[in-house]
Amino acid sequence: ANSKTVKNEEKQLNRLKGKKVTYLVQNEKYSFTTNQIITRATYQSGKYHFDTTALNKQIKKINEKHATLDKPFKFKTHSGAEITTTANGSYGWKISEKKAGNSLTKAIIDGRQEVDGKYDIEGKGYNTAGLGYNVTSNNGIGDTYAEVSLADQRAYFYKDGKCVLETDIVSGTNNEGNKTPKGVWYIMYQQSPSVLRGQNDDGSSYASKVNYWSPFTLTGCGFHDASWRHNWSKTAYLSDGSH
């Protein structure tokens, strides 16, 4: 018990006691002590090993207040109606419990007194880094976005708070396999030109050339032109919508 190794391990662990770290999330400060961050710590072969389970409840509370991932958004539509979106969708961010644990324990080791939570966010879908942390306008959605009304089969494209384009659309055919999902999503990437590939309802394959492709789901929903389409009626999507 008196070996140099054990004494050094004890010394390194004692270094961590009684520390305080301020965690900054969207300009709000949260103060954590060593005991609130670290449930258990060991020091072996020159490295610390931490269990930060103690922190998880606090991060959950922070996410309940600040995070936007998997939450509904309050939104004013083009028509002026105030709605609440479904919690479905890929857009948003939250603090990762694992990342927060790593950054806060590192701060304790390094003797730093403040950590910025923006480096600990995560998201889902194509971009797992999370989106919208610095966006506070329009209830977290921002002022540049595309709004799609499935009821009106109409799309409105906003840039810096101004509608710069509105157009008729035909959404996915209104069945379980093809209907356009509700919620707030982010554009994953953009391709021009592109080829859309998939299967028709009869099982045959298709490959459609388009000039513009901006997908927003991993299952193939997105914005694109459709030179082959002749039926642009408001009810086309009910039985003759997009794939």
Task: State where each predicted segment sits.
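Active-site scaffold segments
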Residues: 212-216, 220-243
